[in-house]
């Protein structure tokens, strides 16, 4: 397809096109798309996945940033009345407004260099999807799915919105051009109810940034520095929340962070 249209993948856009048909079908299966679903596809590329989504979904909004690919994409999906192709940068668009209403499904092949920014943009939108199925670097997917003891800012920033899981590993050879690392299909099932209101969510992110500022240090020390209080005061507040002051940020689960936000809300 690229050769026929005299096009080359753009390194500056992190373009690696998923070309393995079996993998494409597995991604659609992981998304559990039905005829009642509205799908927002990010990074539609050459339309291989777009066509499969269009065959299953009620409607598909396919977003592609590369102006060169849009005419090709429109040609590939021209037989599908339920697919609309849009040219633009998803980071400059409102995903929820594109989808039209809550409960839509996001399917995306995300460039490695802006993975975190795109995930955050999709999760933080006011009009929430039901789930996201993302093709991302395997190592990043594993970090997002980490459990207490190995948690990170990235993992907590996703897990506060939904439950992540890895649906499958995608070998580098499934892409063109072939990247240096393997990828994974990451599925995020959004919680039906948010864990925090808007103010609490801001406090949560402020708190975890404090906790992970020096993640090898004990929480009594990182929170003392972040809240500008003494170590003894920080230890007392942690103990009041049922958290051992000598623990480190990566060992706390989401419920413990929520309890800690409630305990420290007067200082966050």
Q: What feature does the model see in each segment?
A:
Residues 224-226:
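Short helix-coil junctions and helix-kink-helix linkers
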């Amino acid at each position: 397809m690229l050769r026929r249209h005299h096009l080359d993948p753009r390194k500056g856009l992190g373009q690696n096109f998923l070309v393995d048909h079996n993998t494409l079908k597995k991604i659609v299966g992981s998304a559990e798309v039905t005829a009642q679903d509205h799908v927002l596809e990010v990074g539609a590329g050459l339309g291989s996945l777009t066509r499969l989504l269009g065959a299953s979904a009620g409607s598909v909004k396919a977003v592609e940033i590369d102006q060169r690919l849009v005419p090709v994409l429109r040609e590939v999906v021209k037989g599908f009345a339920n697919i609309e192709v849009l040219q633009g940068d998803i980071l400059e668009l409102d995903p929820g407004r594109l989808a039209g209403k809550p409960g839509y499904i996001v399917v995306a092949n995300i460039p490695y260099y802006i993975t975190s920014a795109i995930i955050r943009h999709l999760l933080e939108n006011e009009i929430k999807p039901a789930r996201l199925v993302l093709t991302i670097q395997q190592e990043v997917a594993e970090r997002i799915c980490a459990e207490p003891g190995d948690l990170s800012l990235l993992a907590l920033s996703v897990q506060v919105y939904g439950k992540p899981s890895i649906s499958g590993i995608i070998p580098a050879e499934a892409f063109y051009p072939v990247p240096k690392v393997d990828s994974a299909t990451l599925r995020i099932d959004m919680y039906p109810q948010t864990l925090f209101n808007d103010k609490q969510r801001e406090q949560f992110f402020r708190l975890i940034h404090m906790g992970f500022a020096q993640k090898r240090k004990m929480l009594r020390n990182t929170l003392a520095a972040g809240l500008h209080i003494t170590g003894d005061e920080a230890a007392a507040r942690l103990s009041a929340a049922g958290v051992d002051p000598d623990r480190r940020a990566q060992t706390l689960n989401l419920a413990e962070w929520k309890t800690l936000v409630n305990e420290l809300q007067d200082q966050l």
